[in-house]
Amino acid sequence: KAEPKKVGAILKVKGNKYKVTKSKVKGSTVEFTGYTNKKKKKVTIPESITVQGVEYDVTSIGEKAFSNCKKLTLLEIKTKKLTKKTVAKKTFKSIRKKTVIKVPKSKYKAYKKVLRARGLNKKVKIKK
C-alpha cells in the first residue's frame, strides 16, 4: 500500500521541487518550492504530482520558488487551487519582465490579482 511522505518532506518530480504540506492517504498536498535547473526556460506547475503511487495536489507556491530564475521565459500554472493565502508574499518579485505566465482560463481574473499582489511586475504578461 502506498504511504504518503511526511509533512515537510521534499519531493523532486520532473525537475521541480515540492514540499509536502498535508500528508493523508487521500487528500495529500504539496507546495511548489522551485526547480532544480536554474537554466530552464519553461516551468510548469501542475495540478498534481504522483510519487510512489501517492497523488499530491499542488495547492501553494513557496516564497523563494523563483529566486535566481534569470533564464525563465514561460511559467505555466495548471493548478486551480492557488489563493492569495497560498502564494507567499514575494514569490514573483524576481521574475523577469520578459517572462510570460500562462494560467487556466477559469482562473485568469483571480490569478491576475493574486500574482500582482505577490510581487509580479506589471510588465509581465499573463495569458489564458
Summary of predicted features, one role per range:
Residues Y111-L115:
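Short, surface-exposed terminal/edge motifs of secreted or surface/virion proteins that either
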